[in-house]
Amino acid sequence: MFRRVFVPACLAALMMVLVSPPATAGVIWEEGSFDEVMARAKKADKPVMIDFYAVWCGPCKLLEKKTYADAQVTAFSNKFVNTKVDVEKGEGVELAKRFRIMNYPTVLFLRPDGSEIDRLIGFLEPPEFLQLMKDYYNGVNTLDDYEARMNEDPGNIELVFTVGRKYVDRADRESAMPILDKVMAMDPDNEKGYAEQALMQMADAERKAGDISAAIAFGEKFVESYPESENTKGVLYDIAYYHKKAGDNEAALGVYKDLITKYPDDVNALNSFAWFCAKSGMALDLATDIAQNACKLSNDDPGILDTLAEVYFARDMYDDAIETIKKAMAKDPEDDYLKEQLSKFEEAKKLAES
């Protein structure tokens, strides 16, 4: 995609002589199926960068708007064949299963033969993203690289932990757990802070393997062992999510209530509570108050407004839902997800009035 520059007619003659190249407006994404993209990569002998995303995912949108728009990221991305995969549509559903994509966004880096180099999970600022792109392109700080270094220096707890974490990132519990057990043994009193990190990774490994009961047990052990840790909030999020995934919404609601009690001014905690209530149909009166407060604290962030709109929608308050989502759209008018939300609310109102 290129930015077009318009100039006065009197400069047209000069422009015929002196023309500067157009500036790229972001990463160029290849169209086509996965097999077609891989065939192009193999022919060009280039690695592949695949952005696995969901349309509703806030960090995915931020990665697109901020990181992929960065000039240096854009320039270096030309060393890859780049493509985007919607994990909820078409072959994206199967590709997400094939590569064990369980967090969004996940940016997967593959060799031309289709084998994995490494992956990035979540939003990263442009400088960090760029550095890791360069590292992975050069085979540095990948799982293979860290594992080789760990084998040369097995007493280095940072290397051991990083290898374990990278296996968790790939949803490889069998490889991850023995390594994370070793981390726990190397830092039994958590003096270096690695024991609690390992416990968090163990919970995530079990979650990705589908053993939700084990994930909950590891999470609860963390909260009991490290109640004042800066990571406790995130672990409470995880425990609530695990209960929800297991179908125990009552237990999930209890954890979410603990979360907003412990962190009453945390926008993400409030938003998570309200979103859960909207989707589960539980505690909707309280969720309305909580979501309204989250909107105030976030200065009406579009994503938080969307949550409030969903709470109204769950209460059949369609006019309020429509008004709120329009407020979100005014702040982010190009967001397709918000447009879909408006259509959903308007259709529901029509059905209710028919």
Regions of interest found by a model, annotated:
Residues 135, 139, 169, 208, ...:
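Register position in tetratricopeptide repeats
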